Curated annotation (Swiss-Prot):
Residues 8-95 form the 2Fe-2S ferredoxin-type domain. Aldehyde oxidase able to catalyze the oxidation of retinaldehyde into retinoate. Acts as a negative modulator of the epidermal trophism. May be able to oxidize a wide variety of aldehydes into their corresponding carboxylates and to hydroxylate azaheterocycles. It is found in: Cytoplasm. Pfam families: Ald_Xan_dh_C (PF01315), CO_deh_flav_C (PF03450), FAD_binding_5 (PF00941), Fer2 (PF00111), Fer2_2 (PF01799), MoCoBD_1 (PF02738), MoCoBD_2 (PF20256). [2Fe-2S] cluster 1 binds at residues 47, 52, 55, 77. The active site is at residue 1268. It is an enzyme of class 1 (oxidoreductase). It comes from the Eukaryota. This is Aldehyde oxidase 4. GO terms for molecular function: 2 iron, 2 sulfur cluster binding; aldehyde oxidase activity; FAD binding; flavin adenine dinucleotide binding; iron ion binding; molybdopterin cofactor binding; NAD binding; protein homodimerization activity. The gene is AOX4. One of its GO terms (biological process) is xenobiotic metabolic process. [2Fe-2S] cluster 2 binds at residues 117, 120, 152, 154. It comes from Cavia porcellus.
Amino acid sequence: MPSLSGSDELIFFVNGKKVVVKKPDPEVTLLFYLRRELHLTGTKFACGEGGCGACTVMVSRYSASSKQIRHYPVTACLVPICSLHGAAVTTVEGVGSIRTRVHPVQERLAKCHGTQCGFCSPGMVMSIYTLLRNHPDPTPEQVTEALGGNLCRCTGYRPIVESGKTFCANPTVCQVKRPGRCCLEQEEEEAGSVHTREKMCTKLYDKDEFQPLDPSQEPIFPPELIRMAEDPNKRRLTFQGERTTWLAPATLPDLLELRAEFPQAPLIMGNTTVGPDIKFKGEFHPVFVSPLELPELCVLNSEGDGVTVGSGHSLAQLSDALQSIVSQQPSERTETCRALLNHLRTLAGVQIRSMATLGGHVATRATVSDLNPILAAGKTTIHLVSKEGERQIPLDGAFLEGSPRAGLRPGEIVLSVFIPYSSQWQFVSGLRQAQRQENAMAIVNAGMSVRLEDGSSTIRDLQVFYGGIGPTVLSASRTCGQLVGRQWDDQMLGEACRGILDELRLPPGAKGGQVEFRHTLMLSLLFKFYLRVQRALSKLDPQKFPDIPEEYTSALEEFPIGTPQGTQIFRCVDPHQPPQDPVGHPVMHQAGLKHATGEAAFVDDLPLVSQELFLAVVTSTRAHAKIISIDTGEALALPGVVAVITAEDVPGENNHQGEIFYAQREVVCVGQIVCTVAADTYAHAREAAQKVKVEYEDIEPRIITIEQALEHSSFLSPERKIEQGNVEQAFKHVDQVIEGEVHVEGQEHFYMETQTILAVPRAEDKEMVLHLGTQFPTHVQEFVATALNVPRNRIACHMRRAGGAFGGKVTKPALLGAVAAVAAKKTGRPIRFVLERGDDMLITAGRHPLLGRYKVGFMKSGLIKAVDLEFYINGGCTPDESQLVIEYVVLKSENAYYIPNFRCRGRACKTNLPSNTAFRGFGFPQATVVVEAYMTAVASHCDLLPEEVREMNMYKRPSQTAYRQRFDPEPLRRCWKDCLEHSSFHARKRAAEDFNRQSRWKKRGLAMIPMKYTIGVPVAYYHQAAALVHIYLDGSVLLTHGGCELGQGLHTKMMQVASRELGIPTSYIHLSETSTVTVPNAVFTAGSMGTDINGKAVQNACQTLMARLQPVIRRNPKGKWEEWIKKAFEESISLSATGYFRGFQTNMDWDKERGDAFPYYVYGAACAEVDVDCLSGAHKLLRADIFMDAAFSINPAVDIGQIEGAFVQGMGLYTTEELKYSPKGKLRSQGTNDYKIPTVTEIPEEFHVTLVHSRNPVAIYSSKGLGEAGMFLGSSVISAIWDAVAAARKERKGAESVPETLAVRSPATPEWIRMACVDQFTDMIPRDDPSTFTPWSICVS
């Protein structure tokens, strides 16, 4: 650290108010400062690496040179506060507030039902708001692009995009690029034709209620900042922190002076590389140099032979500049510019593109850089400058590979980059493939350029660069050199492929894995470039250069990023229903406006408590080992550290129901909590946690996979089995028997709000108060009481809302609550425990990986006579919910099909992985994808469509399940029929077959899936519920119940129930929180039964109150509610009532293999259509149609939101979401960089949802629980992918490399799709013997 006399003041504005920081710390981010110092908690912490957009804010800067103000979005978690000198920051609180005025962006997001849990909502608001500040009349494409850097786990994005499109002059952009009318033109017709005897509605909100957007009313940029920017006497700024120094030079000479003095100090512009490296790789820099806003770094000159771009330009600014240049220059001059533009659209999200700079992108030379390969292929040069002078170097292979002779010298900086214009016979392309279309680092990317001799196809110069193949971007220079002088033809392509494989081959166990896939991508991307040049030559001279075959043209078409459209159809409310009765109406989420304004408080938004400490975890780095020692000395010596908590500090039991709070003597998985550190700040706690030294001694066996568990007979529970008919006998009397197995990998919950707990000890009576987001407060209370060795009545758990849960907050908060409570007990001080995203993923695990083995006997007609299923799930190291999950797997495994001879067996395997737990669908999404796999296999063997086999074997009449529960499948048949008809399945299937005949390298697939989904659990006492309703003397009502608001709209529906039962508007009703103090012994909110059971309890309480009020009402029937309440009080009538619902009487006798296991079923059907790129493995979801049996929907907006959100989450399970583990059991997917949930670009271009009416006398108001059912319908997407891949493989049928049966698995990632689409390029890839190397990652299912 330099020796400096003092620190300058940091000046910036937040929401129009001046902020002056006397001693700013360079290590403090804007997110931390907003939340902890300014108490602006609307900006959320969710990932900490700029990958989710929850912390999006708008930064505004004035440029003295251009005299313009620039507004741009940033992720506050990556922005050092020291970089904000002279800037204005706008947070969601500065946009609008319920207390003052709600902004149109916030209002429309809420009223369009674009919020569920609400944790991502402030970031969504800020992304759309920033777009409108720059483009008050945006296009739908701009709305979609603006949201590309924001993640939502609840809604499925459709209503969020729709809210943004309400600001567009023309919000409708038809996605139909094939025969057929626009979906929106058919909307009214569809609504009229579905159940013609019922009136159907298509509008979930009234756009006439929206307040108009008036750009003139937005806050002005602070004049003081303009004066600061134009000050001619600027000087260097120095900010001195606790450990680091920030130096902000005012001039270029000053920058070069600092660079010479501190050559190792990183230059901070956007902090998108250095910031994550500091946080996740433990890097430390005593000095930072930040040359923001230096005019010499912001030059832009497009005159002459190319474009000179200053290194300080953000990637967003670079994109704007290139768009302008491309529009002005002839196309043959802008080959490189257009290639860069194409990549910039999908590189990261808008926030990161607005922060990251061209200079930083070039200088870091990252292997996954999307721009450097293109810049190198385009013969770009770099202008370097230092105190010693200036020089230019080529951005070539030597530079990118890190050659000392070709890189930056000490003291140098990148001043600018020169991108030469291309010539007529030069062709440049950028190509990439990532796990998803946008906001994902490339698996492999490439920059390719060829210069041909004028008028010929002879190669004069060839440049091929690949990222993602080695530690740096690599050049195939040897191969390219050998091809100079050759003709651009098929023979050259074959030699190029062989040469590149030889020159750039990855070792078999290379970091990142996917070796064969990456090798294949190298050739596939080269082939795409080859075709593109062939096509361009034919356009230059059709007589001389033949065009590529018509069926090959699809290889040149990138999947577009469309704007989703769709319809939502539901039953209208009976016109005779009283107007004040909200049941059946699409009512906005009761906290929607609070979500959108950032005023909805989550646990970490609660104000700091006096003497509060922060907790950080130390987790095991071994999968199975003995703990030899824990050395806490160095950690305890650090400033601010109060205590290190271990198993020895647990006053009560350290092991409850098999769950271990703090590891004791041994660890049983990577990620198990060994100890925690309590300190005065989170930064101090985390730093100290990294200093704790744990010595281990490995224990064998180390069991990671299901196969290993089977080998060691390692199980968590006994086998569960159901059987009907005579399976073995039936196999002897069928035409054909097939066998197979399907691996279904796990899934991370990725709730936006990580596990968060505030534990506050009370001085009296050993009481402890916990605030947390959970689905099961009673369970937390039980675990904390056990750990502290106190009665449960001393533990109070308060739960207002959770930022998403999906099953991940049923059991895990109990474990973590006990950990936090023990720390609070030891220190005697409040403990705030907020898991980092990576720690959350590591510790809490997720959906169970599953191995399914099937044996199916069927007739030539496709009729299935016998099925034998074996399921194994990877339960992890402790019981958790694995027993219940495997029971669900077995009970739900028949799905919608009647198989007369059916047997299913299941076991939960014990492994040395973190314990997997409940997840939306509870085993059904894993098990039934195996069922659909064998349905597809049977269809293939019978030369039938899978849909024909499904329909043939579907339940058709009132029946009983394999476990002898009776049901009527009429709604199932109706959903199937309606979906078949209204999705135009057969017409589209024929069109897809025509498309596939005409397209070699892209294939289209369709699939339609039926569903019979169970609601509730087979244990009766888990269906009980209670409520507490108070009526106050002013007529207002306080409602409390035992259910937890997780974003599913439970509180909204409970208010609708209370409103109907009490006959008052919902405005009279307030619902504050769920608490063990008000409603004791409440069961978990899960299994889609929250509304069913809590609604009955609320109804019971309200009916009790209304019965008490009846004498008063009869005497004054025309009186007002307030008058009745006042009179009741005067007559000493109790205005408080508890409500209780005993529950559904379900049971399951596993010894007899029979029972009425579930209260009722939800039925549905979904049709999905996808395009698959056979060369890259990418896929595009074109359309999805969902028909869901909703019975009578209490709130169609909430129910449709649940269906859409579950469908997209299911789609993620089956496509983009891939958990990778090392052979030693370490989770490699720990954050947004490594784990990819769907973004706005993955959802269907056409998304249609119809609620099908039926009757359900079991549930309140004849409704049905719809929180989970849509999850499995996402499997229609993977089934459509299988269909498209089968079409690709059909063209290679008979080839030795193409087995007759496609071995399917989930997820269908780009890797699986590409390698399944076997072709001449996959045939060229060398296969390494698995026994000769250790793989980077393994399949644990």
